[in-house]
Structure formats: structure tokens, C-alpha cells
């Protein structure tokens, strides 16, 4: 039986509202919500593409910045195009007037840098140091010492507290914890509550897993080092010097364990590589210190002295010698190999662009993974020239970090990272439209250079 109170009422839907009302309501939504609206129906598609909605987004994101349209013309372009043009250009550093801060530091050049939301973390010798970005923007340059190892820091990783039981309140779920390894044989976990020490390796610890392993009930991370072992550590356990945190010691490598990565299709699988090119895959759900090598579920080999590796979905990419080899972790068969003429010194995988980049002696090469097969010889889609020396993080002998478009390989900018006649770039980190580089200031001091392009207004095209 119909509800009497509803009799006589007319049926009204969202599409009965006028365009002005809809666009005003849409201005309170996120860009993701607007994208969902665009595919729902024709009327909401018109709202999602309206200039008033995107003008609101533009003003919220970049106050006091005038819109710039592609090709410098605003006659036929929409505000949506202006927003997307600036959003993309900022992340490609296509501006010449970013907010810039010169940060001198006493001692050795930083060799690892991480962005932790609004904080910059970097290692300098045996020390872990930090900078608050809000202070930098306000012009207050103050480097804080987070803590120290007893020898050089070899690896730094950030893991989300949401994946652990270490947060004290719901507000802390979105925070990160820092895990570092060192030549002093120790691993340290740094959080707001202090630090914890993990002891187990008998030699310098060189590498840490790039992600946490396991499910919600038992998250752990892995480490590898010069003692040839892979060790699994519980992220949640406590105890003196971390003895209770050591879950398992995995044996099987006969050489230094230099790299490791967690499989993309199964978070319980860990891939480790030693300096002699031996690759081992471990199922960490069956790991036990009581049974040696029992959880090794696959082995293969690549050229010696690998310089980089990355797991994506079910494939493992390993750069070593003059080649990058892709291995299917489900079958342990080689999917394909790409080869370049010069030795590879650095490697980075860009899954969103189906691309990988290899750094050689005097240039970098950009490869399109969609064109790769094991039967055809593949040429790089772009050669990124302009560097001097080995392309590692810009080049240790190059004063500049060069910026390239990942689609075309076109150079978009060049950023100085070191003083003239000094060494080149020793480390760098990128977070959206922010970049930090490390280099030399003089013969005694190192320098960090921080650039934030968010408020930049002078596009590189205006200088042509």
C-alpha cells in the first residue's frame, strides 16, 4: 500500500535541477567525484566539464595564479584544459621560477633522501637528519638530527603505520615509520615514540625490502647483507635489541645479498639477489629459522653485479651488465631481455607509463614495455642525452639534474644541484611538484637544494 504522506508529491531527480545549481553543488566535490559524474549521464557530463567547476578547482589549488592554456591560446580552450595543463606542467617541472631553498650541511654529501609527507629525511654518513618543509617555505632553515647509527647508513625505507599495530590512536594511522640499515650490522626503526634496534646480522646490512610482507595479522620486513643471509623481522614485536622481532633467517645465497623486492602479485613472496647474480624467491609464509632454505620456491640467475631490480605484478625486472631481464615469477621463465650498448649504472621502472629507464655512461634510455618481446630486437623509444658521467641520480660528475618527458623523452628543464667545479648529484627525491637534490657546496660542506614548483608562474615556453 502506498504511503499516504507521499501522495500528491511530484517525483524530482537530480537531473531536474538547473545547470547553475548543479555546478554550484559540484564545486564541493573532489576531482575524482567529478570524473565519476562525467560518465554517469549526459547532463552530469556537461556539469563535469563546465568552466565554472574547473575554475573553482583552479582557484582552490593555485591562488593568485593566472590560468595558462596549451600553446598559449585561450580562445578555444576550456578551464579544464587549463587546469590539466598546469597540473601536468608542474609535475614535469616546466617552470623556471620555483620556490628555492639552499640548505648547507656540514660533512659528507647526503646519499639517500626521502619525502615523508611534509618532512624531508636524508642520511649523511652515519646520521639520519630531517627538515620540515613548512619551515623551509617560511625561510627557516633548520636541520634536525633524527638519530645515529655507528657506521654508514646503507638503506632507508618508509612503511605506513596503517600496516602495523604501532600507532597509538586513529590519528596516527596515516603516519609512516622509518626503517634504516647500516654497516654497523644493525637495523633501526624510527617513529614518533622513539627508535628500536634490530640485531641479528653478523656483517654490514646492505638492503631492506621495498614493501612489507604478509597479511594484516603478521606484517614483516626483510633485510639482506654481507653475511649472505636474508632475515625476516616482525614490524610489531618489541624486545631488547629486537631479538623477539627476528622471525626467520633464510640461507642459500653464497655471496653478498645486495637487492630485494616484494612480488607485486603476492605479498608473501620475496625476491633477493646476490652480487654474483643468483636470484632466489622465498615464500615467507613458510619461513622458519629451524629449517634451512625450506621456503625457497624458485631460483634463476642474471649477469653479475646487478644495479637495480623491481617487481611489478607477476614480473621481476633486473638490470645488470648491459641488459634488463624480465622474469615471470609464476614460472621462473624469462619473459624478455632488452640490451643496450653501454653498461647500465642505474635503473627505474615507470609502471603507469609502461616504461623503464636505464642510465648509461653518457646518456639515459627510455624503453616502451608494450613494444618488447623475446623474439624481436627492440630499440629505445628515446635517448635522454645531456648528462656527464654515469647517470645515477642525475650523474655524480654532472652539476645539473635534467628533467625529461616520459612519453617523448624531450628535455623539459635542467636544475643545478652542486657548486661549480664540485662533484655532481649524490642523491635526489621527487614528490609531486617538489624536488630535493644533494651535492657539494665547497670542499668541506655539502648542500641540499629544495624546489617547490606549486606557486611557479613563469612557464619555460614563455622564454622561447
Kindly give the residue locations of the regions a language model identified.
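Structural hallmark of WD40 beta-propellers
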Residues: 34, 117-121, 163-179, 195-196, ...
Amino acid at each position: 500500500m502506498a504511503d499516504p504522506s507521499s501522495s500528491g508529491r511530484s517525483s524530482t531527480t537530480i537531473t531536474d535541477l538547473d545547470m547553475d545549481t548543479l555546478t554550484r553543488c559540484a564545486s564541493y566535490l573532489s576531482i575524482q567525484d567529478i570524473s565519476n559524474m562525467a560518465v554517469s549521464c549526459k547532463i552530469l557530463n556537461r556539469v563535469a566539464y563546465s568552466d565554472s567547476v574547473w575554475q573553482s578547482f583552479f582557484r582552490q589549488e593555485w591562488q593568485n595564479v593566472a590560468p595558462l592554456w596549451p600553446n598559449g591560446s585561450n580562445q578555444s580552450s576550456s578551464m579544464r584544459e587549463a587546469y590539466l595543463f598546469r597540473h601536468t606542467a608542474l609535475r614535469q617541472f616546466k617552470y623556471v621560477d620555483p620556490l628555492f631553498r639552499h640548505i648547507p650541511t656540514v660533512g659528507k654529501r647526503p646519499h639517500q633522501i626521502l619525502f615523508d609527507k611534509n618532512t624531508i629525511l636524508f642520511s649523511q654518513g652515519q646520521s639520519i637528519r630531517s627538515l620540515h618543509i613548512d619551515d623551509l617555505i617560511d625561510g627557516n632553515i633548520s636541520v634536525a638530527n633524527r638519530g645515529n647509527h655507528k657506521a654508514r647508513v646503507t638503506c632507508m625505507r618508509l612503511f605506513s603505520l596503517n600496516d602495523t599495530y604501532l600507532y597509538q590512536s586513529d590519528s596516527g594511522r596515516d603516519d609512516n615509520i622509518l626503517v634504516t640499515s647500516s654497516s654497523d650490522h644493525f637495523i633501526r626503526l624510527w617513529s614518533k615514540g622513539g627508535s628500536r634496534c634490530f640485531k641479528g646480522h653478523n656483517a654490514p646490512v646492505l638492503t631492506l625490502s621495498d614493501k612489507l610482507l604478509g597479511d594484516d595479522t603478521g606484517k614483516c620486513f626483510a633485510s639482506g647483507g654481507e653475511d649472505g643471509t636474508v632475515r625476516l623481522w616482525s614490524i610489531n614485536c618489541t624486545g631488547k635489541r629486537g631479538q623477539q622481532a627476528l622471525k626467520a633467517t633464510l640461507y642459500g645465497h653464497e655471496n653478498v645479498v645486495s637487492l630485494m623486492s616484494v612480488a607485486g602479485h603476492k605479498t608473501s613472496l620475496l625476491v633477493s639477489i646476490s652480487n654474483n647474480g643468483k636470484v632466489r624467491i622465498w615464500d615467507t609464509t613458510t619461513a622458519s629459522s629451524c629449517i634451512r632454505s625450506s621456503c625457497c620456491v624458485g631460483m634463476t640467475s642474471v649477469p653479475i653485479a646487478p644495479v637495480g631490480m623491481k617487481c611489478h605484478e607477476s614480473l621481476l625486472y633486473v638490470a645488470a651488465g648491459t641488459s634488463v631481464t624480465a622474469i615471470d615469477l609464476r614460472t621462473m621463465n624469462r619473459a624478455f631481455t632488452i640490451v643496450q650498448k653501454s653498461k647500465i649504472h642505474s635503473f627505474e621502472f615507470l609502471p603507469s607509463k609502461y616504461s623503464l629507464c636505464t642510465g648509461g655512461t653518457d646518456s639515459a634510455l627510455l624503453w616502451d614495455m608494450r613494444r618488447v618481446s623475446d623474439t624481436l630486437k627492440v630499440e629505445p623509444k628515446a635517448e635522454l642525452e645531456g648528462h656527464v658521467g654515469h647517470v645515477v641520480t642525475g650523474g655524480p660528475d654532472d652539476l645539473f639534474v635534467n628533467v625529461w618527458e616520459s612519453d617523448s623523452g624531450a628535455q623539459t628543464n635542467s636544475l643545478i644541484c652542486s657548486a661549480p667545479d664540485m662533484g655532481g648529484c649524490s642523491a635526489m627525491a621527487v614528490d609531486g611538484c617538489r624536488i630535493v637534490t644533494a651535492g657539494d657546496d665547497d670542499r668541506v660542506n655539502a648542500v641540499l637544494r629544495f624546489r617547490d614548483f606549486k606557486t611557479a608562474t613563469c612557464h619555460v615556453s614563455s622564454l622561447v
